[in-house]
Structure formats: C-alpha cells, structure tokens
Amino acid sequence: MGYCHCRSCRSWSAAPVNAFSLWRPSALKVAEGVEHVAMFQKTPMSQRRYCRKCGGHLMNNHPTLGLVDVYAATIPTLEFKPAVHVNYAETVLRMTDGLPKFKDFPKDFGGSGEMVLE
C-alpha cells in the first residue's frame, strides 16, 4: 500500500495523490455489480477499470507486473497502512511522513529504484 504521485494517477483520481493497494488478481473478486465494470486500456501496463453505472474509478490492472492496483478508498473495510511513495519526482503535494519516496518506481517494478528526499 502506498501513494502514487504521477500526473496520470492524479488526473484519473482528481486528487493530488492516489492511495493504492496492490493485489494478485486471484485475490480479488467484485462482490456485486460486476456487469457494470468496464475497462479502458491506457497503456500495455495499465488497464483502468471503472463503473459504467456511476462512473466511479475502481482499479488498475497491471498485467506486465501480475498485480492489480485497487484504489484504497474503494474498499471500505481496508485498514490503509501506506508503506511507500512512488513517482515522487512528479509530486504536487510534499508529504513529510518518514516513508520511502521513490523518484519513479522500485527496480522490481521497472523503475530506477532511485530514492528522493522528503
């Protein structure tokens, strides 16, 4: 769990940061309304899922990573415990919270692994 500061996530979530939680696809199930879930293929690495009925943004599937980024606010029972900031070089909202801040992404996720200061 963490915060993404990239321009794309900020625009998609209409917020200065996007709180995310990462899951394996096999660990996820849409409990109800699955017939209303639509997908927009932004890039080969990002398949955005949203509700056709209300327009709410739900999650991003990242097939190249084998992970799904479920927006933390869409899981009412989730105890959000952020552990990292990604794409902090693009931030518009500085956060002093002691968490690691990656310039882009960790190396395991295709980034530089470079850290930036708070």
Protein language model features and the residues they cover:
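A short Gly-Trp-Pro
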Residues: M1-E118
